[in-house]
Regions:
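Transmembrane and membrane-interface helices of multi-pass
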Residues: 1-2
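Solvent-exposed soluble domains appended to multi-pass membrane proteins
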Residues: 16-218
């Protein structure tokens, strides 16, 4: 209430009033339904609802249509969008538009991050990405988020080219990362993909790999 009393911006106070008057409870009908389960998080870099296609992407289609899907949810296209949205998914914090928040605050520790939530429950946590540290300091960020082990394209031994458009294979990411965690009794693994990354105006090895299969699409 003090926040409302001290705020002079009417728009901000409209939001403040909305949130303060919400009926918040620590439990609902979904509380505990996944207790004791393992978790694999896949952050898909540079994709959209094109994959909601049963013919071409049956697994993703099944996950989207038979699981929980949140339509009124948006990833902000701000400064360094991948790193910032990755940070949001790990901490539930909104990132700052005028800086690469993940890199700017890479030395912070985040006890509330998703890795630490699972660490506190006795899980083995790990994270993986099929690219190098050119853009985001994941080697620092992920451990500070609580990831017990972070492995990039080199440690996963995934072939790749330093040419900008030659992104590594996400298929190999899954194949190389999975053995590191799948045999743990309780695990939480976080994978960030890269293959569909821009640019989209030039050919690339991964981009052309299945091109003939989509010849009927515009």
């Amino acid at each position: 209430k003090a926040l409302i009393e001290n705020e002079v911006n009417k728009t901000y106070n409209k939001l403040n009033n909305y949130f303060i008057n919400r009926n918040i409870t620590p439990k609902n009908e979904y509380t505990g339904i996944f207790e004791g389960k393992n978790l694999i998080v896949i952050l898909m870099e540079s994709t959209n609802e094109i994959f909601i296609n049963e013919k071409e992407y049956p697994t993703l289609y099944k996950l989207y249509t038979e699981g929980f899907s949140f339509r009124n949810n948006y990833s902000p296209r701000n400064n360094c969008s991948t790193g910032n949205n990755e940070m949001t998914s790990m901490t539930s914090l909104f990132t700052i538009n005028n800086t690469c928040t993940a890199n700017t605050y890479k030395k912070n520790v985040y006890p509330e991050a998703i890795f630490n939530i699972f660490n506190n429950k006795g899980y083995t946590t790990s994270s993986y990405h099929d690219y190098a540290e050119y853009y985001y300091a994941r080697r620092t960020i992920h451990p500070n988020m609580g990831s017990m082990a972070y492995r990039n394209v080199t440690e996963l031994k995934i072939p790749w080219s330093s040419v900008y458009e030659e992104w590594p294979s996400d298929t190999e990411l899954v194949e190389k990362a999975t053995p590191y965690f799948i045999n743990e009794e309780h695990f939480m693994a976080y994978l960030t993909t890269v293959t569909p990354h821009q640019p989209y105006t030039v050919s690339s090895e991964m981009g052309n790999k299945h091109l003939e299969e989509f010849s009927d699409y515009d």
